[in-house]
């Protein structure tokens, strides 16, 4: 671990105290895990503490840990992962919070801390079904209005449930159950004895 990362790690441990569930280093970055109950308070501390000053939320996304590590994962299924940047101190940290309930994954919204979280949280809600409590306008942002399910969940079928097509008779777009025709996906290989000037 570099001196800069060691300094950041010490500052995080001092400022957050027992709110740190785990703090690990990998590939030159620190990953901080906090409990859902401490998430909002920890994020506010990360922004406001003078020794940290993470002024900017760079990214926020959802993660589905179902079947993670070939089924070796036995923790909570859903997490929200944020990447924060301190312009003042020129360092970054990744913050992970797991939703305690797999059936209805809920974590606090950080839109009151960083307004840039707005569309990131909407995207995580749309694609993973993560509910961000306190979000001012939590609705779908990428999928269609009548879309059912959350397409980035690992239990969502790759083909989806319905397909959309234009119906010339009704003169509008219609939805219908997915129709997939079986097809040969193995390429046909033709071997020639003298291909490329090589002799066999």
UniProtKB/Swiss-Prot annotation:
Catalytic activity: a quinone + NADH + 5 H(+)(in) = a quinol + NAD(+) + 4 H(+)(out)
HAMAP family hit by this protein: NDH1_NuoC
InterPro entries in the cross-refs: NADH_DH_suC (IPR010218), NADH_quin_OxRdtase_su_C/D-like (IPR037232), NADH_UbQ_OxRdtase_30kDa_su (IPR001268), NADH_UbQ_OxRdtase_CS (IPR020396)
Domain of life: Bacteria
PANTHER family: NADH DEHYDROGENASE [UBIQUINONE] IRON-SULFUR PROTEIN 3, MITOCHONDRIAL, NADH DEHYDROGENASE UBIQUINONE IRON-SULFUR PROTEIN 3
Cell division keyword on record: no
Subunit comment: NDH-1 is composed of 14 different subunits. Subunits NuoB, C, D, E, F, and G constitute the peripheral sector of the complex.
Known role: NDH-1 shuttles electrons from NADH, via FMN and iron-sulfur (Fe-S) centers, to quinones in the respiratory chain. The immediate electron acceptor for the enzyme in this species is believed to be ubiquinone. Couples the redox reaction to proton translocation (for every two electrons transferred, four hydrogen ions are translocated across the cytoplasmic membrane), and thus conserves the redox energy in a proton gradient.
Topological relation to the membrane, as annotated: Peripheral membrane protein
Assigned EC number: 7.1.1.-
GO cellular component: plasma membrane
Single GO MF descriptor: NADH dehydrogenase (ubiquinone) activity
Keywords: Cell inner membrane, Cell membrane, Membrane, NAD, Quinone, Translocase, Transport, Ubiquinone
Organism annotation: Ralstonia pickettii (strain 12J)
Subcellular localization(s) per the UniProt record: Cell inner membrane
Gene from which this protein is expressed: nuoC
Region forming the signal peptide: none
Family label: Belongs to the complex I 30 kDa subunit family.
Nucleus keyword on record: no
PROSITE patterns tied to this protein: COMPLEX1_30K (PS00542)
This protein's name: NADH-quinone oxidoreductase subunit C
């Amino acid at each position: 671990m570099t001196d800069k990362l060691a300094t950041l790690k010490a500052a995080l441990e001092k400022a957050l105290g027992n709110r740190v569930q785990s703090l690990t280093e990998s590939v030159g970055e620190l990953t901080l895990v906090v409990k859902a109950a401490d998430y909002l308070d920890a994020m506010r501390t990360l922004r406001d503490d003078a020794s940290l000053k993470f002024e900017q939320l760079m990214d926020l996304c959802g993660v589905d840990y179902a079947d993670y590590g070939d089924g070796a994962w036995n923790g909570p299924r859903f997490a929200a992962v944020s990447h924060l940047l301190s312009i003042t101190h020129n360092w970054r940290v990744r913050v992970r919070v797991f939703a305690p309930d797999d059936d209805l994954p809920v974590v606090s919204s950080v839109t009151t801390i960083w307004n840039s979280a707005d569309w990131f949280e909407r995207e995580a809600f749309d694609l993973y079904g993560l509910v961000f409590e306190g979000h001012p306008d939590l609705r779908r942002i990428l999928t269609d209005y009548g879309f059912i399910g959350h397409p980035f969940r690992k239990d969502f079928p790759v083909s989806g449930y319905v397909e959309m097509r234009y119906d010339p008779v009704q003169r509008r777009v219609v939805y219908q159950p997915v129709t997939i025709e079986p097809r040969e996906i193995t390429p046909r290989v033709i071997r020639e004895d003298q291909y490329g000037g090589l002799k066999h």
